[in-house]
């Protein structure tokens, strides 16, 4: 599978499914384009080979804030529910590639819905469940949503009722469906939709995966589109640093509402053939209990939680901690010194920086992939150029290229061509001191920014 081959090119990591020889990628040029692969094909491949492997785990406190049971889904069960839901979506007779909004909190339903929309041949549009009616309306209009999948209850909030108000103001929204209980009148009950739907293999050709839409900075006026292959590539690049093995667990505190949450959570778990456990609503006691559950675990958390985690007695089975930053960001000074007082162990920490919705860059502290080193000298980036490459302009701003950062803006719902080999400019530049990056800052573009100063060249091997 292309994602695993991309990982093996850079580091010999475990794969999502068995049967791919370790030597398969040796001698493969670094700039070979990655073959097309989708999140759904990764789910199906693992479901066929390891049907009893755990795919998604709901948080134990889920009934308290949703009135829905906490379920542990095997890969086989998840694949069946995804196909049932996808068949139901196809029965709506929407044109292929229609935009379907997902306004869900990040529990198992969110993961299954993302996969089902892809399997139905439509575009999943990630709508943060925290958005109010006005922002949801703006997103629906800007993306030209045809349908939305949501949830009846989230704590004291009622997302389905909020979206009913949006549907009354935006007539292009043809279908509104929600997971229950207590689904409002006029809203399709997704639980019934799934249970009453047909099971088994899909009839006829499976529609092509159509990608997804997210929003830059959580702004409904700034939708961007990326293909499913680009999401898989972003997850593959992240896993080079995080090194998640099949059957291990990713415990994520970041919802799949944007690139940073999706690529480090659901997509990473599917690429690695691992388990994903999420915590849509953070609770300290529930988090402590989840962290101490048996089994090798990789934690994905917002970077601001580093101080809290540093003071904890962390379980021995915690293999790594991915601290996810949003640019602009500052690297904590103590993160550069291994074994500092009250600090996390450097070799288990991965810094991940989200450059808007353009790209993710991940590196393990205390190694040659430490982001303070890589962003200090871009030629230290060792990922395959087909996956991601990096340059800095004369004004210091970073630009990305490669399948992991192939993204394009939507203009009133019209999707432009996704640039294959074009550089994706960002407004962010590293702050350098003695050859190290100490922060990422936002800078105004200068007139001479077009000429690159430093390239991260393609790596031909290890």
Regions found by a protein language model. Give the residues of each.
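Conserved AMP-binding/adenylate-forming core of the ANL superfamily
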Residues: 31-35, 55-93, 98, 107, ...
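Gly/Ser/Thr-rich phosphate-binding loop
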Residues: 180-182, 188-196, 298, 310-389, ...
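Short beta-strand->loop structural element characteristic of the AMP-binding/adenylate-forming
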Residues: 101-103, 110, 114, 118-154, ...
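AMP-binding/adenylate-forming
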Residues: 123, 142-151, 210-214, 221-309
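Conserved pre-ATP/AMP-binding loop-to-beta segment of ANL
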Residues: 36, 51-54, 178, 183, ...
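Conserved ATP-binding/catalytic segment of the ANL
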Residues: 392-462
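Structural core segment of the AMP-binding/adenylate-forming
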Residues: 2, 122-193, 291-322, 459-462
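Conserved AMP-binding/adenylate-forming
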Residues: 68-71, 84-134, 251-259
């Amino acid at each position: 599978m292309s994602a695993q081959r991309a990982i093996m090119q850079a580091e010999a990591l475990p794969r999502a499914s068995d049967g791919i020889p370790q030597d398969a990628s040796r001698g493969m040029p670094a700039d070979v384009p990655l073959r097309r692969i989708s999140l759904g094909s990764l789910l199906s491949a693992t479901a066929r080979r390891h049907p009893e492997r755990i795919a998604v785990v709901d948080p134990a406190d889920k009934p308290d804030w949703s009135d829905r049971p906490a379920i542990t889904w095997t890969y086989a069960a998840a694949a069946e529910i995804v196909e049932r839901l996808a068949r139901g979506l196809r029965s709506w007779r929407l044109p292929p590639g229609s935009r379907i909004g997902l306004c869900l909190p990040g529990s198992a339903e969110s993961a299954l819905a993302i996969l089902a929309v892809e399997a139905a041949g439509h575009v999943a549009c990630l709508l943060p469940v925290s958005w109010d009616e006005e922002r949801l309306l703006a997103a629906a209009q800007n993306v030209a949503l045809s349908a939305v999948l949501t949830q009846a209850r989230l704590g004291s909030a009622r997302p389905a009722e909020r979206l009913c108000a949006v549907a009354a103001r935006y007539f292009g929204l043809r279908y509104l469906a929600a997971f229950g209980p207590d689904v409002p009148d006029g809203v399709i009950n997704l639980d019934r939709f799934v249970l009453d739907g047909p099971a088994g293999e899909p009839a006829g050709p499976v529609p092509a995966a159509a990608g997804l839409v997210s929003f830059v900075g959580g702004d409904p006026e700034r939708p961007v589109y990326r293909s499913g292959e680009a999401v898989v590539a972003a997850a593959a690049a992240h896993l080079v640093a995080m090194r998640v093995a099949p059957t291990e667990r990713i415990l994520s505190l970041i919802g799949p509402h944007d690139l940073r949450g999706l690529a480090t959570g659901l997509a990473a778990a599917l690429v690695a053939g691992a388990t994903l456990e999420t915590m849509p609503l953070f609770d300290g006691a529930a988090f402590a209990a989840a962290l101490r559950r048996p089994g090798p675990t990789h934690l994905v958390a917002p970077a601001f939680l580093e101080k809290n985690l540093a003071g904890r007695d962390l379980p021995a089975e915690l293999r790594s901690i991915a601290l996810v930053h949003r640019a602009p960001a500052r690297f904590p000074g103590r993160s550069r010194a291994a074994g500092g007082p009250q600090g996390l162990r450097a070799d288990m920490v991965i810094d991940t920086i989200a450059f808007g919705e353009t790209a993710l860059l991940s590196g393990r502290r205390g190694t040659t992939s430490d982001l303070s080193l890589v962003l200090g000298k871009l030629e230290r980036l060792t990922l395959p150029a087909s996956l991601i490459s990096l340059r800095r302009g004369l004004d210091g701003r970073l630009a990305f290229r490669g399948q992991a950062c192939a993204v394009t803006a939507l203009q009133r719902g019209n999707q432009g061509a996704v640039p294959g080999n074009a550089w994706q400019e960002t407004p962010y530049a590293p702050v350098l001191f003695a050859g190290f990056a100490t922060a990422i800052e936002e800078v105004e573009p200068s007139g001479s920014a077009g000429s690159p100063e430093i390239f991260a060249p393609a790596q031909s091997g290890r």
